[in-house]
């Protein structure tokens, strides 16, 4: 395991930025014109070649509801990478991101991947095996944007086809992922953008089902931090929800890069 989150924070981020980050987020959400939007026709952008910089990776599943994997793409990536790039010293691609199918060998270059709308995700046996190997080799999976029992049941079946012996367990705010950069004091408060009845829950899967070992998968259930980040400049959602989405996403990336 890599050094503790507190030590890694000083490596990647300036402490002064951390103290004033709330003001920065409020100031930056978002003056720049939005170049891409879901109002425009969907277009899959070309992947950037691996060059050692952090690249946001989204997973494209080939079975399930058509195009569900692409929710919030690519504006969410642009907004998040802008925030992360301005607040950190990470070398990253601000204006480019990658989309990989689950069994793409190129995925092995990247330590973190994002999977959205898993309530429609049905991996093939080949995809499940490839994703399992990626996770077991050290990959960190972020799962986002699904709510209520029906979507949970689909996700759980798919996830257990990837990690058959996995136990999906509730996360506690004391876990290092919630203090990887931002100090998140509570996991209560956010809801899924589609309905305030869906109260956010955070769950995880640990290596060997052992909470003392590496967290392999973080699950945002009854939440959609991608949507909050995508539309953070439009005024559709409460600013505190957009800010919280950036905080969770930033912590996930820092944790994934340091564990």
What is the meaning of each model-derived region?
Residues 1-16:
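N-terminal secretory signal peptides that target proteins for export/translocation
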Residues 20-32:
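Bacterial N-terminal signal peptides
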Residues 36-112, 116-119, 224-227, 231-259:
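Aromatic-Pro/Gly-enriched surface loop or interdomain linker
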Residues 52-55, 108-113, 136-140, 166-167, ...:
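Loop/turn elements at helix/coil->beta-strand transitions in domains of secreted/extracellular proteins
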Residues 56, 112-152:
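Short alpha-beta junction capping motif
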Residues 64, 150-232, 241, 245-246, ...:
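An acidic, glycine-rich "communication" segment
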Residues 77-81, 128, 132, 152-156, ...:
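Extracytoplasmic/secreted envelope proteins and their assembly/folding machinery
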Residues 90-100, 143-147, 166-174:
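Surface-exposed patches in mature extracellular/periplasmic domains of secreted proteins
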């Amino acid at each position: 395991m890599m050094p503790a989150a507190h030590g890694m924070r000083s490596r990647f981020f300036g402490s002064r930025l951390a103290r004033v980050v709330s003001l920065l987020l409020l100031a930056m959400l978002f003056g720049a014109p939005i170049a891409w939007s879901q109002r425009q026709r969907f277009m899959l952008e070309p992947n950037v070649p691996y060059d050692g910089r952090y690249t946001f990776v989204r997973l494209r599943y080939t079975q399930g509801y058509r195009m569900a994997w692409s929710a919030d793409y690519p504006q969410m990536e642009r907004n998040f990478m802008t925030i992360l790039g301005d607040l950190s010293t990470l070398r990253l691609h601000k204006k480019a991101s990658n989309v990989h199918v689950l069994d793409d060998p190129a995925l092995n270059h990247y330590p973190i991947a994002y999977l959205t709308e898993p309530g429609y995700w049905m991996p093939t046996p080949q995809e499940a095996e490839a994703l399992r190997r990626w996770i077991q080799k050290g990959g960190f999976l972020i799962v986002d944007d699904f709510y209520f029992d029906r979507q949970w049941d689909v996700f759980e079946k798919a996830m257990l086809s990837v990690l058959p012996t996995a136990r999906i367990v509730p996360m506690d705010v004391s876990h290092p992922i919630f203090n990887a950069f931002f100090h998140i004091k509570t996991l209560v408060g956010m809801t899924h953008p589609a309905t305030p009845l869906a109260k956010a829950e955070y769950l995880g899967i640990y290596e060997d089902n052992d909470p003392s070992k590496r967290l392999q998968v973080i699950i945002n259930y009854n939440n959609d931090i991608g949507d909050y980040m995508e539309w953070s400049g439009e005024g559709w959602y409460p600013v505190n929800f957009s800010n919280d989405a950036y905080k969770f996403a930033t912590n996930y990336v820092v944790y994934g890069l340091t564990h």
